[in-house]
Amino acid sequence: ALVRLATKYFQSHAPATLADFVWWSGLPVKECRIGMEQISSALTVKMINGTEYFLHESNRYGKMQKDSITLLPPYDELLIGYKDRSAVLSKEHERKAYNTFGIFYPVVLHEHRIAGNWSRKELSVTFFENDKPDAACLEKAKKQYEKFVNTNR
């Protein structure tokens, strides 16, 4: 069961640290280490800001196209599935992604980083910084969301 849990976690969370896995699973550090050791042949280590992150061989992280944009819903696993969110979210923008009461907002993922917020009603996007991604990529992300919503009605 431990091997399966570690495999599923690292397949769906990338990059992730040992601390992230411990926090998400609720298991002791020792058990999480054992699970990670048992799947070590499927994990690659990546250093990000001096911290050791692990990527499962099946994960798409790093394979996204340049200037890729994804509109993520509130409470997306990208934010709630990690103890330390610094790999995807700058400290200065944390309160734009979630508040101190645990309310998470819809966010824009741009090239592996949370780069803004978006509104479902108007399908409008606000970026945290002045630089904006390619307009065609943003339109593609909006169309993907619209297709998803229309498919699931």
For each predicted feature, which ranges?
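Long, charged, low-complexity, helical-prone intrinsically disordered regions
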Residues: 1-153
